[in-house]
Amino acid sequence: MENRGRNPSFLSLLLLLSLFAIASAKVFFEERFEDGWEKRWVKSEWKKDESMAGEWNYTSGKWNGDANDKGIQTSEDYRFYAISAEFPEFSNKDNTLVFQFSVKHEQKLDCGGGYMKLLSGEVDQKKFGGDTPYSIMFGPDICGYSTKKVHAIFNYNDTNHLIKKDVPCETDQLTHVYTFILRPDATYSILIDNQEKQTGSLYTDWDLLPAKKIKDPEAKKPEDWDDKEFIPDPEDKKPEGYDDIPAEITDPEAKKPEDWDDEEDGEWTAPTIPNPEYKGPWKAKKIKNPNYKGKWKAPMIDNPEFKDDPELYVYPKLRYVGVELWQVKSGTLFDNVLVCDDPEYAKQLAEETWGKQKDAEKAAFEELEKKREEEETKDDPVESDAEDEDEAEADDSDKDDADKSDDKDDDQHDEL
């Protein structure tokens, strides 16, 4: 029998090549929040004067897949949060940029951010806040029913530009990994839990540059342009007597009341009702216009204001990563922050952390939810009484069934 399997040496070569590619990845910043993390991160004093600065907890959360894998979590409601870390300055020119992190909303978030930022140049980390310029902002944002999306915002020429596509974010209480990939050809991908959710181009999905083509402002619709798709049928004629049909007629079912007195009530007149034969003003039926040319559109021309930027994707002085957000309800946990140039390395990191822990985390969450529901049932006397009544009704029903069964057995016994 012919062996159609892969040559073991070939598979080994593929594995080695894959490992080599990952090993050659440039990692500009990687934070798993292990020992010493506080030396790498600077807590901002932004909003402290107003007593509105929130504190961070170092924790693995109330439920997790590994109690030893910790991150930083917002801990106070109705607070602003700002924290950042510095890494050696680099440019993503001619290279792929990968920005990835995990986030978990333990608080059943109803309004608050879960995004992170990449910043360039010189930043006073102690003053890092909402007004600090940034290069890229990326991650989930939730507020009410209307906002449940992934932000992907680019700063270009000192203006922040939001992505024009809608990318829904995860809204449960489990950990999810968000990945943004920006390539030298100005294309991008957004991944959630290693699954691509959106992809496209900086040229089309953001308004970073003026449009390449615009409608010709000098163009005018030709006078003989027929844009009526349907026209009245010239062969259709109005039926004879059509205009003589009244809109209302006397109700043939109406009868003069027996107690009607003409001398006192006046002459009785039957009420009128809509005439079922009346069809309204006559209109000729519509037919397709044989001269229809379609809806007129101005021709597109080159936009004189468009100037291409081959370095549209480039951020030459990336140097910081930070979290800056407002939360109505706290409990968001950030972990496993990565800035690198290799999507495969990012994928591997996600699998080594989130991938290995997700099932255990989900099981732990479901167990806690089960206990919480049981406790709420115990603490709710109305619900407990209702359950007792249901049980009592069930017992009475069982008793009635048993009595009926006994009576039936007695009847059968008498017949015997």
UniProtKB/Swiss-Prot annotation:
One of its GO terms (molecular function) is calcium ion binding. Keywords: Calcium, Chaperone, Disulfide bond, Endoplasmic reticulum, Glycoprotein, Lectin, Metal-binding, Repeat, Signal, Zinc. Disulfide bonds join C111-C143. Residues 266-304 are annotated as: 3 X approximate repeats. Residues 197-262 are annotated as: 4 X approximate repeats. Sequence repeats lie at residues 197-208, 216-227, 233-244, 251-262, 266-276, 280-290, 294-304. SUPFAM superfamilies: Concanavalin A-like lectins/glucanases, P-domain of calnexin/calreticulin. Molecular calcium-binding chaperone promoting folding, oligomeric assembly and quality control in the ER via the calreticulin/calnexin cycle. This lectin may interact transiently with almost all of the monoglucosylated glycoproteins that are synthesized in the ER. This is Calreticulin. It comes from Beta vulgaris.
